[in-house]
Amino acid sequence: MSQVERDHATLQAGKVVYTAKTHTSGGRENGASRSSDGRLDVQLSLPGAVRIGTNPEQLFAAGWSACFESAIGVAARKRRIALPADPAIDAEVDLHLADGGYFLSARLNVSLPGLARDVAQALLDEADQICPYSKASRGNIDVAIKLV
């Protein structure tokens, strides 16, 4: 069985712990997205448009950085390392157009002030293996995760 087949089998056997549900209409140019529980209710617009709204790249950056910071916490607890009170992640997601197609790239710039650099880097490396967004993007888009 290949690694892909093993991963798929694990996913099929895994317990669903949460399902996010949203309804989107109008697309990225003049749309809106709302979650089924009402906690997310956003207008969508193109970057730089007159209309106020967010876009899929901003939502992806926010989701990934929040998830990655939580994964750092999981890694820290596993290693019994106290995290600083003010960890932060600046996420950048680029939308590219090349050869008639769109694709993404991303950078996560992680700040863990007060931790030794080698300890912080070990946490980032482990978090990258834990975070579902990192797993989903691995091998699909160019990603740089950097300790700043």
Residue ranges of predicted features:
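Extended beta-strand/beta-hairpin segments
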Residues: 1-62, 69-148
